[in-house]
């Protein structure tokens, strides 16, 4: 299932811009049927995890898989039907393209400098110390780099935290004041 994989190799430079068109529906239906191992008409997180590759020959981060499923599962069925799967496919493909764009050395991993470039490209202005924190938090392999699946997870968490912060930053000055309970509510909403 090469369309799910990111395996760097010769000529694996930056991909097309995020937002590329979806492949043909019959192609996606064939992929959906192969991934739906139990033929339930719904792809579970386990089925999706087994179908995905992060390019490191390790299982795709289950937390990332559950996050993606929860974004697209409109009926709270702990999985995605075919219609929802087309959104999952596009979401993952768009992230692959972003990842390839910032994986400047085509290593299949994002190092600190590549992460800084990616997050800066997304509009974040963060300190070197914070980039170090992100690397430590999302580097499951302990190599000082982030794999594709963990890059997605890190970006999802950063976006959720940013959204929560913005709700409290009513004057948009980059500072908030919250009570301890508000802080706990913010943290528990993303855990």
Curated annotation (Swiss-Prot):
Calcium sensor that plays a key role in processes such as endoplasmic reticulum (ER)-Golgi vesicular transport, endosomal biogenesis or membrane repair. Acts as an adapter that bridges unrelated proteins or stabilizes weak protein-protein complexes in response to calcium: calcium-binding triggers exposure of apolar surface, promoting interaction with different sets of proteins thanks to 3 different hydrophobic pockets, leading to translocation to membranes. Disulfide bonds: none annotated. Changing residue 180 to A: Abolishes the interaction with PDCD6IP, TSG101, ANXA7 and ANXA11. Does not affect interaction with TFG and SEC31A. The gene is PDCD6. This is Programmed cell death protein 6. It is found in: Endoplasmic reticulum membrane; Cytoplasmic vesicle, COPII-coated vesicle membrane; Cytoplasm; Nucleus. One of its GO terms (cellular component) is nucleoplasm. Changing residue 122 to A: Increases interaction with PDCD6IP and ANXA7. Impairs interaction with ANXA11. Augments stauroporine-induced cell death.
């Amino acid at each position: 299932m090469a369309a799910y994989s990111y395996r760097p190799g010769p000529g694996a430079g930056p991909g097309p811009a995020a937002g590329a068109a979806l492949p043909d529906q019959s192609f996606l239906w064939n992929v959906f049927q192969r991934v739906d191992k139990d033929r339930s008409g719904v792809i579970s997180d386990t089925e999706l995890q087994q179908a995905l590759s992060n390019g490191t020959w390790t299982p795709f981060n289950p937390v990332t898989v559950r996050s993606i499923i929860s974004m697209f599962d409109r009926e709270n069925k702990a999985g995605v039907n075919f219609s929802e799967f087309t959104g999952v496919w596009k979401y993952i493909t768009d992230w692959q393209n972003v990842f390839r764009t910032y994986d400047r050395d085509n290593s299949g991993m994002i190092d600190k400098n590549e992460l800084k470039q990616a997050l800066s490209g997304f509009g974040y202005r963060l300190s070197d110390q914070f980039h170090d924190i992100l690397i430590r938090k999302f580097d499951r392999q302990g190599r000082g780099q982030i794999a594709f699946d963990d890059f997605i997870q890190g970006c999802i968490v950063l976006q959720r935290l940013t959204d929560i912060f913005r709700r409290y930053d009513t004057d948009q000055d980059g500072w908030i004041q919250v009570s301890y309970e508000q802080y706990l509510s913010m943290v528990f909403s993303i855990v």
